[in-house]
Design a protein with these regions (language model features):
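Short, glycine-/aromatic-enriched active-site segment of Class I SAM-dependent methyltransferases
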Residues: 17-23, 65-88
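Conserved class I S-adenosyl-L-methionine
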Residues: 2-62
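Charged, amphipathic alpha-helical linkers/stalks
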Residues: 170-214
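Glycine-rich, aromatic-lined ligand/substrate-binding cores of catalytic
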Residues: 83, 89-169, 174-178
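Catalytic cores of nucleotide-enabled group-transfer and carboxylate-activating enzymes in metabolic
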Residues: 1-10, 92-95, 110, 160-163, ...
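Long, charge-rich, low-complexity alpha-helical segments
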Residues: 120-135, 140-155, 159, 200-366
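Flexible loop/turn segments at secondary-structure boundaries
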Residues: 10-17, 117-121, 166, 275, ...
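Flexible, glycine-/basic-rich loop-and-beta segments that form/coincide
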Residues: 36-60, 162-189
Length: 366
């Protein structure tokens, strides 16, 4: 199996540490304050200090890196600021230190969940070559040099047991190997979800690849390689292009998919999360889930937020959301739910007849 560990990293956190110490200093003597009050105080003082620095050109130039870090923190959500900058324990490390710690515990480093921090071949070829020259036998060391270049502040490392390390391959990120049979076999096992829209299609130089992605986006953006290749071949036939143009287009398609897998334009799944459909008389929301969401809505949002099956953050939870979660605390019939919807939402509207209220509740249910 694998495990996921996220942590703050040097060298980027050397500057972030200055912001953290400023916020801790601003909150000294305020132990009785709530977490939210401490975050507000830290942000207020940070904004004040930043504004003073900006008033003087010499200070602005000398502290440009600190100002960048401060600006970044000011724009973050309160829960993040509280977690990273006001918690008593925050011990960043370099990637090589993290890797040494893994080795000492019979574990191995696989890569980063942010593939741009691991797949060094997506960068300029000269950069990738230089990193390989600096650390020819160590992927982790190449990434450490990359961290110095990017001033990385945060990593999301994927790790495994040392005994499984022999199966790790980074060939998928190498343009020279993307169209080999082993790499194509790996890519063919995923389901993909396109995150960019049609306006971004101009980035594809190959017309057949562009037409393929346009068709996939119009079809909802979720696909596998069998479907994508079928669309590409149909586009090739429709364009009356020569047979010699098909294989280069297939290679370009694989290259495009891999590049956007790494850069974040395409999500990829070994098992695509299926949407759970509501089933009358069967579906319900366990009380423990409702209680958790209620705790988040009642102030827990300072510390934690909800996410969906794609690991996207869910915004503000409304009273209406909670109401429906509570209504569905056990399986109910449609008639029971529509009556409760009518009584809860529409019965107060005296301008509507009972018949109209029933119709609105029915429409709301559907």
């Amino acid at each position: 199996g694998i495990a996921y560990v996220s942590y703050n990293t040097y060298p980027g956190w050397h500057t972030m540490e200055e912001v953290r110490q400023l916020m801790l200093f601003a909150n000294r003597g305020h132990d009785e304050s709530t977490h939210k009050e401490k975050v507000l105080r830290g942000k207020t003082v940070g904004s004040l200090i930043g504004a003073q620095i900006l008033n003087y050109d010499n200070l602005k130039e000398r502290n440009s890196k600190f100002l960048g870090a401060l600006r970044s923190v000011m724009q973050k959500d309160d829960y993040y600021v509280g977690h990273d900058h006001l918690e008593p324990h925050n011990d960043p490390c370099y990637l090589y230190q993290f890797n040494n710690h893994l080795k000492a515990h019979n574990l191995a480093y696989v890569g980063d969940a942010d593939l741009t921090l691991s797949m060094v071949r997506i960068y300029d070829e000269s950069i990738a070559d230089k990193l390989e020259q600096l650390a020819p036998n160590s992927q982790a060391d190449q990434e450490q040099y990359l961290d110095f270049m990017l001033d990385t502040t945060f990593r999301k490392s994927i790790i495994c047991k040392a005994s499984a390390a022999k199966d790790i391959s980074y060939a998928v990120s190498n343009p020279a190997e993307v169209n080999t049979i082993p790499v194509r076999t790996v890519i063919n096992n995923f389901t993909f979800q396109i995150l960019f829209d049609e306006e971004a299609l101009e980035m594809f130089e190959n017309t057949l690849v562009k037409d393929t992605f346009q068709a996939l986006i119009k079809d909802g953006g979720t696909f596998n390689m069998i479907e994508a290749l079928a669309i590409l071949k149909a586009a090739h036939e429709a364009s009356s292009a020569s047979d010699d143009e098909l294989e280069p287009a297939v290679c370009s398609l694989y290259n495009a998919v891999v590049e956007h897998m790494v850069r974040g334009g395409i999500r990829f799944y070994k098992t695509f999360p299926e949407k759970q459909e509501y089933m009358e008389g069967l579906s319900y929301v366990p009380t423990r889930f409702t209680n958790l969401v209620k705790a988040i809505a009642d102030g827990g949002g300072e510390y934690i937020y909800c996410g969906n099956s794609f690991n996207d953050a869910i915004g503000d939870i409304s009273e209406e959301d909670l109401m429906f979660m509570e209504l569905l605390n056990k399986p109910k019939s449609k008639s029971t739910l529509t009556k409760k919807i009518k009584d809860t939402i529409f019965s107060a509207d005296k301008s509507q007849t009972g018949k109209h209220q029933n119709a609105m509740a029915e429409a709301f249910y559907n």
